[in-house]
Amino acid sequence: VSFGIVSPDGREGMLQNAAEFAEAGIPFIFDPGQAMPLFNGEELRHFIELTDYVTVNDYESNLLQERTGWSEADIVKRVKAYITTRGPHGSQIHTPEKTYDIPPAHERRVTDPTGCGDAFRAGLIYGIEKGYDWLTIGRMGNLMGALKVEHPGTQNQRFDFDEFNEQFKQQFGYAL
């Protein structure tokens, strides 16, 4: 295992997975999502101290800051990247060095938003694993979400890398 994600699951499972990733030296994304209310501020701060990346939406970002008592800057200085999705407004990636405003990818039609966040994170993981720059990683995540929203259900979209790359080039003006 070279990369992981701790996403909404049972409370004990999330705590255990984060501890095991950290102990094994495996970089991982902490994605608290709808499980955030299961944890107190101290536990959320501990997750942030263990992880390399935090990903949340706008609402979750505010809640995470409120529950931890940490500002966005406090979180950013503890991780490689603090990633916030902003729905139709794209996303932001905050690193200790710089904040990247990532433009949205435009879908052809909106069919079902269920699973868009998961698709976004799949793009992030792929981009991080392949060593792309943050602007490209964010664009990959945004495009994955846009492609997902065009299809019903959570896993009914299918495309290969060449098709994805063509969409990426059309959306952002350069190929991967």
Task: Give the residues covered by each predicted segment.
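Conserved post-catalytic alpha-helical subdomain immediately downstream of the catalytic base
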Residues: 78-81, 105-175
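Ribokinase/PfkB-type carbohydrate-kinase core domain
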Residues: 1-101, 132, 163, 169-176
